[in-house]
Swiss-Prot record:
Record-listed E.C. numbers: 4.1.1.50
Cofactor requirement: pyruvate
Post-translational modification: Is synthesized initially as an inactive proenzyme. Formation of the active enzyme involves a self-maturation process in which the active site pyruvoyl group is generated from an internal serine residue via an autocatalytic post-translational modification. Two non-identical subunits are generated from the proenzyme in this reaction, and the pyruvate is formed at the N-terminus of the alpha chain, which is derived from the carboxyl end of the proenzyme.
Naturally occurring in which organism (per UniProt): Exiguobacterium sibiricum (strain DSM 17290 / CCUG 55495 / CIP 109462 / JCM 13490 / 255-15)
Family membership noted in the UniProt record: Belongs to the prokaryotic AdoMetDC family. Type 1 subfamily.
Name this polypeptide is given: S-adenosylmethionine decarboxylase proenzyme
Enzymatic reactions: S-adenosyl-L-methionine + H(+) = S-adenosyl 3-(methylsulfanyl)propylamine + CO2
Gene3D superfamilies to which the protein is assigned, alphabetical: 3.30.160.750, S-adenosylmethionine decarboxylase domain (3.30.360.110)
Record GO biological process: spermidine biosynthetic process
Keyword Lyase: yes
Length: 128
């Protein structure tokens, strides 16, 4: 294994607004996505905002899945982070996008834990 984990950041647009605003549906979708990927679910926490929107997290033994939904824009911000090489986060990310009826899907995968990031000296800020 070259990395400690894989992190998929998914931008989902033109989603079904009713699904994005249904906390119970989104929670079930995320738990099912984790299970479809072969992950072990540990904790689940979701919150419904007024007048609309859902945020939530599914903690898995291998890391986490998160969402912030904006039904009024048909948009969802989704993260799927898995540690190790046993679980493929893309399986969960695609399952979620399908479940939200996302017509536009932009996924970026970032390898995690590959060592210190080299930052040019001019951009480093020291916080006291």
């Amino acid at each position: 294994m070259d990395t400690m984990g894989r992190h998929i950041i998914a931008e989902l647009w033109d989603c079904n607004p009713e699904k994005l605003n249904d906390m119970e549906y989104v929670e079930r979708l995320f738990v099912d996505a984790a299970l479809q990927a072969g992950a072990e679910v540990r904790e689940v926490a979701f919150h419904k905002f007024a007048p609309h929107g859902v945020s939530g997290v599914v903690i898995i033994s291998e890391s986490h899945l998160t969402i912030h939904s904006f039904p009024e824009h048909g948009y969802a911000s989704v993260d799927v982070f898995t540690c190790g090489d046993r679980i493929d986060p893309a399986i969960a990310a695609h399952y979620i996008a399908d479940g939200l009826d996302a017509k536009i899907r932009e996924n970026v995968e970032i390898p995690r834990g590959m060592g210190p990031v080299e930052v040019p000296a001019a951009t480093v800020q020291h916080v006291n």
